[in-house]
Amino acid sequence: MGLCKCPKRKVTNLFCYEHRVNVCEFCLVDNHPNCVVQSYLNWLTDQDYDPNCSLCHTTLTQGETIRLNCLHLLHWRCFDDWAASFPPTTAPAGYRCPCCSQEVFPPINEVSPLIEKLREQLKQSNWARNALGLPVLPELNRPVKNIAPIPPPPPPQVKHVSYDDSPAQKEIPIHHNRSETPATHLEMEDTASYSVSNSDVTFARKKNFASESSSDTRPLLRQDRDADNEENKYKRRPTIDWMRGLWRAKHGTGVPEDRTSGRKMAIFVMFLALLALITIITVLKRAGYNGEHSSDPMFDPMANPNIRVAVDDSRLPHL
């Protein structure tokens, strides 16, 4: 369980693998539509994730996506084609996630932002409307693809070559008559690349994620994020972080900080310090504390025998 960092501050067990933060269902729908999100316990067990679609094996950022009730993310077009291949008489329970075999259609009495968005996306296809008991719309019918017939291959052409026993042809070596083998190219799943000395065979190793550009140097996480690493994850937060959290909850983090906002923050801190000082002094005064040496007789001038104080007597003449 964790606390989402949005202004709603909801307790959630969902965790974004790409941004490494706890997210509630509201943030999942609004701010993380194409991110890989699973439970926090799964993140603690295994931190590896695949940013590609499980059906077409391409990156999820290419095209519209759909998030099922089991939190698995797929391309909407791939999932629509996959589900439309089922027979029309398939029951709603027969449509299951291709990753975990959990039912695609959520229960009727279950309500959440994620499920509401899922139902709205499923209503865009007639196979889902039929399973949900909704009327089928003609404008949502899938177009029939006209497959052009493949023409038969042309018959092989045989060339008639005449051979003669000329002396020039006898000088050709024996191995020259063998047909030349074309170069063979193999692709292996790894990150290294090498080639052997034989010029006919070339080995090339392919990257695991060929769709991603190797020149992309954008950081995965922001530099000013609140990193929940292993060192300070369960430590007690200082007071300044608590005050900064209240400030962000009220004013947000989207507005860039300028000198005016920093000055306001400094004035606010000085005001709190002055208020705390006045409160401490008032409490000490009401408790009767007048200083460290207020009850020490050594500092009482009337108890010192070397100090003589004139007593006001009416019998003594006044000078």
Curated annotation (Swiss-Prot):
Entry's CDD domains?
mRING-H2-C3DHC3_ZFPL1
Zinc finger map (RING-type): 53-101
* SUPFAM superfamilies documented for this protein: RING/U-box
* Molecular function GO terms recorded: zinc ion binding
On whether Transmembrane is a keyword of this UniProt record, the answer is yes
Where do the zinc-finger regions (B box-type) map?
1-43
User: Which of UniProt's keywords are assigned here?
Assistant: Membrane, Metal-binding, Transmembrane, Transmembrane helix, Zinc, Zinc-finger
**InterPro entries named among the record's database cross-references:** ZFPL1, Znf_RING, Znf_RING/FYVE/PHD
Bilayer topology reads: Single-pass membrane protein
- SMART domains the record matches: RING
Q: Which stretches of sequence are listed as region Disordered? A: 212-232
PROSITE patterns, per database record: ZF_RING_2
Q: Which residues cross the membrane?
A: 264-284
Give the subcellular location: Membrane
Q: Where is the composition biased (Basic and acidic residues)?
A: 219-232
- Could you say which protein family the record assigns here? Belongs to the ZFPL1 family.
Its recorded name reads Zinc finger protein-like 1 homolog
Q: Which organism is it from?
A: Caenorhabditis briggsae
